[in-house]
Amino acid sequence: MSDIIREAVTQLQSKIGTFDGSVKFVIEDEGSIILDEEGAREGDGDADCTMSADAETFRGILSGDVNATAAFMSGKLAVDGDMGTAMKLGAALS
């Protein structure tokens, strides 16, 4: 597991814990994370929603320095799947 993935899993666990639904985060050139009712973990399974971004954007979203909606609107964050799940996660991260 890369340091970026490890750090992101730790931050998601402390910030959100568990999540009603499933989201996969794909961090370019690093790997992917699943967040669901079991918590956050490294993984590459099916999810209701998939969010893809580079490591810098993902770190900024987790730290609160980057607004997820603004990242999506500017093309730095790609979302595929259930937009309702993505919006629910965005609210949980803010």
Which stretches of residues belong to each language-model region?
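Feature captures hydrophobic
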Residues: 1-94
